Regions:
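Charge-rich, low-hydrophobicity low-complexity segments
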Residues: 1-169
């Protein structure tokens, strides 16, 4: 009872006086408000402004760098042609973006994202769309193992088959 803890050190510090009933640490937002939340360095893109990247002779680091440069220029729809199953394409996109990939990706494609809508016309290797926070990824063919591991939100769709451990550690 409260009488027995009055003499405790925690009681002297005021730890037993705050009423916690009916309180929560959760913050609730409605969907309309969440559309206006952006990262401080997010780009203002126009989905009607469209461009293409021919990835046939470009390394994956340079492809990702080029995506960011184009977003900085206001492009909201980017088409990547000839991805050649390269690894780690489209990772770390924390922005609204329509990303269309005409072909297949290797390992770790479209990982650690928050916001883009991605359509992949081919297949993806293992660990595609890991740690996705928001947005949508649609794979037209098959996906490897660990597809969508550790996603927290968003929509992840594979129209073909997926490998083992798909969706492991999901929190969304």
């Amino acid at each position: 009872s409260m009488a027995s803890i009055k003499g405790n050190k925690s009681s002297e510090m005021g730890l037993h006086e705050e009423v916690l009933t009916g309180r929560t640490q959760q913050v609730f937002f409605n969907p309309e408000e969440s559309e206006n939340f952006f990262y401080h360095d997010a780009y203002d893109v126009d989905f009607n402004k469209r461009t293409e990247i021919d990835a046939s002779n470009i390394e994956c680091l340079d492809i990702n760098r080029r995506i960011r440069e184009l977003m900085a220029e206001g492009y909201g729809t980017i088409v990547i042609k000839n991805p050649g199953s390269k690894h780690s394409i489209g990772v770390g996109i924390l922005n609204k973006l329509n990303l269309i990939i005409e072909g297949s990706l290797g390992y770790f494609g479209i990982g650690s994202t928050d916001g883009p809508n991605v359509r992949i016309s081919g297949r993806v290797g293992w660990s595609c769309a890991e740690n996705m926070m928001a947005g949508k990824v649609v794979v037209e063919k098959n996906a490897g193992s660990c597809f969508g591991a550790a996603i927290r939100g968003g929509d992840l769709i594979c129209k073909g088959s997926v490998g083992a451990r798909s969706g492991i550690d999901m929190k969304g």
